[in-house]
């Protein structure tokens, strides 16, 4: 007998049924929430009250506990408690409970946000409120629905294209037109005007196949170029007879029986990418002597490693396509006339290790002229529109052509990329690195507390504009998009939120959108390689490294002296800001006597040689000195100024390996974790935050260890346990070291990254062409939002003065 289908009950019905079954118990629980008064409760607070009340008899309340465990927050406005329920990544429901009347009601996103706003303004805002909703524009676009599909957008698109766009002969015409549209600076590629129909294309491909089977496989394309032109085929199919034949076979197979894997492979072989612009305006962007400066860290390293790998892949593919074209990559950043001893005042700078990649610097300016000094990434918003116009002129001058791909980095770079891509009609790729909304909890609802210092109203608006305008989004991890079972992803946090007094976002982004792709970076393996590769070790740096770590001298480069130089080293290196939580690591270490017995602490952060201009860094400096005094850490800690020499930093990781130490990354949230990748690539056992990217990079207990910086006592115990185990059994250190290396080789290399980026550009370029993925309606909506809201907000950010 067939199983009986039963109706899925709504969240309100399930909660109502639980109230009916256990009214007294649930009144007691919700009364506890209400008694805490008006405010917001986080998930752990909700569960703590539940555990305290029902610890002895949980099974009876299991259905309700499941609902509560899926709750991410509660808004308490007595006698009401509203819950934001997240049954799985990317899926949200909202309910409200009246504790006095035992009434349960479901809320729309808009109703929930309006209720939440009462935390700030104390009353329901009955006036008309601007609501931002991108959902109607995406209703006709294909999207997956399973959580496991999040971040695999290109695979989904390939399946969709294969099934829908090639369902009959007529639907193949966009592919024909796409191939005919290919040219570079007026030079035709792939197909010429001799081919006017699909039948003509197939006929030419068959004749070309017949010819290629009759010549040696290594015959260069130049020997049959003219023959192919007569058939309607131009350069771009390959450099040798074998490679051209392979490409022809891919297309013939697609025309016969479309297949997602073949489609991706074919689109990856088509010449589409010769000129690339990469935008990263803020901070000090240079190749040396800048790491550790304000707003200057992992993003700079990421981009420099990215362009080296990308140029190599572009050169390889152009050669394999049989083309004689010189690619060009431009990294666009801000020119700083007051360059603070760096090359940031230089307009053009060749990227070392490349042939065709330059850093081009364009200054910020306003009606008063060029801004000479560094300004915080939080203060750049009034300059970006003029900056975009200046950048557009500069890149056209340098490239003598429109770019084929524009990649934005971080909020400011992504906004400039959006404006440029919109103006030039170019494919856009977005890389967030970090979305500040996640790093600063409740910075949306309590915007007034943050906005004067951080200007988040501008930044969150810019982020929404960029993520909805872009053609595809690259993230380093799944967590960046949609979090985990228990934590909300960075992009996911932009699905629905409110900025009281400005606007409500009722549908800001869809994490199931096929524009999302996980493409993880690696470390530069010429700099970061295992400590066991002794023939490559840079031992010439060892005297300098020993001076840094162990000398008895205190100066502007290193503070405090280690007493016992034989202990293993707990090592950490990061910017000195609140989220990186370096002071939290020092406090964790200071509180645990056993940890101090087992290991020394060496941190690299900030600059003792000059006073920081960054507000947050100034506060962290004061806190660090205070903690060192409070826990009497002199003799146990070495605090080193930020180190600018990447090559020496690579050897520094390996030197820590020699002490049988460990790298600790204690951030409250880390979008990816380049230092985690670097340390693991050097073979240094790595213990990192469970919040963000490191939770995916490290397999806990196999390729490293996870710690929760919000529970510092437990985190310290994990470190103690690690060093105790290593002391009892030295092979345990080797086991974690090798596990980390294995993980890197499988998933985190720049070669894998650049191959994927090239393929994504091909697939999304094709998708954009054949399905009119200009998202014209969306972009008109974005134009209005930019003109009426963003520009107004940016004009309110105070201009900086030299």
UniProtKB/Swiss-Prot annotation:
GO MF term list: sucrose synthase activity
Reactions listed under catalytic activity: an NDP-alpha-D-glucose + D-fructose = a ribonucleoside 5'-diphosphate + sucrose + H(+)
BP term (GO), one: sucrose metabolic process
Residue numbers spanned by region GT-B glycosyltransferase: 272-749
Glycosyltransferase among keywords: yes
Pfam annotation, one family: SUS_EPBD
Role played: Sucrose-cleaving enzyme that provides UDP-glucose and fructose for various metabolic pathways. Most active in the sink tissues where it is responsible for the breakdown of the arriving sucrose.
Full protein name: Sucrose synthase 1
Organism in which the protein naturally occurs: Zea mays (Maize)
